[in-house]
């Protein structure tokens, strides 16, 4: 019962992390315009993501444009795209395996050991999905930080962390935490099929004593 509760907790944590990974992948606010220091606050806020760039007007109107060319993008954007897509796919497979392997489902009840191993496999894939997300988000954030503190970057062209990065960090943490809980599920040891036999006492000592037969030529002391 304890393992079943731990599986449910891990599954819902990892599922929430996977949904957050999808949201982080789709959001265009991976980096946004910086207004720190001497930067002039303009009426237009710029956002950039993995798939598009957006401009937000002071009136609330937002205009977004998809990137025109795939090959013309920077290497870190292409790498982040690949890692996030892989994380989404791994999370989907992990979700299916976890549902099959959890004790609260009816699939594979005839083999509890194999069922637990399937749940552990799902947890491992959730861990990989969270690791891919963490790598992509942290790498992107590192480049944004380097560009921000680069003296050659104009003040009005500097960017800061966007909300999508924080969503990605939180989602990666949830996916890895939930995957860890699923991996902590220990398979049940196989029980021996043999039925214990009742104890039977051995034959008595008297029955084990050998019977000595005298030859016919030997007679007793009375000559009988």
Curated annotation (Swiss-Prot):
Disruption phenotype: Mice are born in normal Mendelian ratios. They develop peripheral neuropathy associated with defects in the electrical sealing by tight junctions in Schwann cells. It catalyses: Mg(2+)(in) = Mg(2+)(out); Ca(2+)(in) = Ca(2+)(out); Na(+)(in) = Na(+)(out); K(+)(in) = K(+)(out). Changing residue 38 to A: No effect on interaction with Clostridium perfringens CPE. It is found in: Cell junction, Tight junction; Cell membrane. The chain crosses the membrane at residues 8-28, 82-102, 118-138, 161-181. Coiled coil: none annotated. It comes from the Eukaryota. Changing residue 156 to A/S: No effect on interaction with Clostridium perfringens CPE. Changing residue 150 to A/D/Q/K: Abolishes interaction with Clostridium perfringens CPE. Changing residue 156 to G: Strongly inhibits interaction with Clostridium perfringens CPE. Keywords: Cell junction, Cell membrane, Disulfide bond, Membrane, Sensory transduction, Tight junction, Transmembrane, Transmembrane helix, Vision. Disulfide bonds join 54-64. Changing residue 53 to A: No effect on interaction with Clostridium perfringens CPE. Changing residue 41 to A/S/V: Abolishes interaction with Clostridium perfringens CPE. Can form homo- and heteropolymeric tight junction strands. Interacts with other claudins including CLDN3, CLDN10, CLDN16 and CLDN18 with highest affinity for CLDN16. Interacts (via PDZ-binding motif TRV) with TJP1 (via PDZ domain). (Microbial infection) Interacts (via both extracellular domains) with Clostridium perfringens enterotoxin CPE; the interaction disrupts claudin assembly in tight junctions. Forms paracellular channels: coassembles with CLDN16 into tight junction strands with cation-selective channels through the strands, conveying epithelial permeability in a process known as paracellular tight junction permeability. Involved in the maintenance of ion gradients along the nephron. In the thick ascending limb (TAL) of Henle's loop, facilitates sodium paracellular permeability from the interstitial compartment to the lumen, contributing to the lumen-positive transepithelial potential that drives paracellular magnesium and calcium reabsorption. This is Claudin-19. It comes from Mus musculus.
